[in-house]
């Protein structure tokens, strides 16, 4: 049985590095690029090396050693043009 926990994140864009860094509490400049370079980041089962990959609603993002989440899309935009995005983390 799979349990999903819904989490809202405040991000600047729908880029993979922005959302994954918020969900897994990783550094966008240090830890996440290293995971991308070493081939430990997957979207829908395919290895991704591009930090700028734009996520689409329904994408399943998996990071080895951190976990997996389903990206559900933008909930709303803030006054400062940032986005609240909805994700569901596998527990």
Segments from the language model and where they lie:
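Short hydrophobic/aromatic patches on the structural cores and recognition surfaces of FHA
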Residues: 31-32, 41
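Generic alpha-helical secondary-structure signal
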Residues: 19, 34-35
């Amino acid at each position: 049985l799979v349990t999903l926990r819904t989490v809202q994140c405040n991000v600047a864009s729908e880029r993979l590095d922005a959302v994954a860094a918020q969900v897994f509490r990783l550094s966008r400049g240090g830890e996440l690029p290293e995971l991308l370079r070493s081939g430990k980041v997957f979207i829908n089962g395919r290895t991704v090396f591009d930090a700028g990959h734009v996520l689409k609603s329904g994408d399943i993002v998996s990071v080895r050693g951190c976990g997996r989440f389903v990206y559900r899309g933008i909930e709303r935009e803030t006054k400062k043009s940032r986005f609240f995005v909805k994700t569901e983390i596998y527990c």
